[in-house]
Amino acid sequence: MGNIRQTNIKRIAFQLLENHRDVFTKDFETNKALVTKYTTIESKVIRNRVAGYVTRKVARMKVY
């Protein structure tokens, strides 16, 4: 069983992937900095969750 992400985290992640798909990588630390750069999220917890979700989606996109 996996974790269920909140709707706002998914929405932000999908918007980031739509607009900046080629910038994100499979590295969490890089994505964390990019999420900070492209959004106005002030909460560290929310930023990390969005970065983790983006990292997971990018890794799955590159596999297929």
Curated annotation (Swiss-Prot):
PROSITE patterns: RIBOSOMAL_S17E. One of its GO terms (cellular component) is cytosol. Keywords: Ribonucleoprotein, Ribosomal protein. One of its GO terms (biological process) is translation. Signal peptide: none annotated. It holds the Pfam family Ribosomal_S17e. GO terms for molecular function: structural constituent of ribosome. Belongs to the eukaryotic ribosomal protein eS17 family. HAMAP family: Ribosomal_eS17. This is Small ribosomal subunit protein eS17. It comes from Methanosarcina barkeri (strain Fusaro / DSM 804). The gene is rps17e.
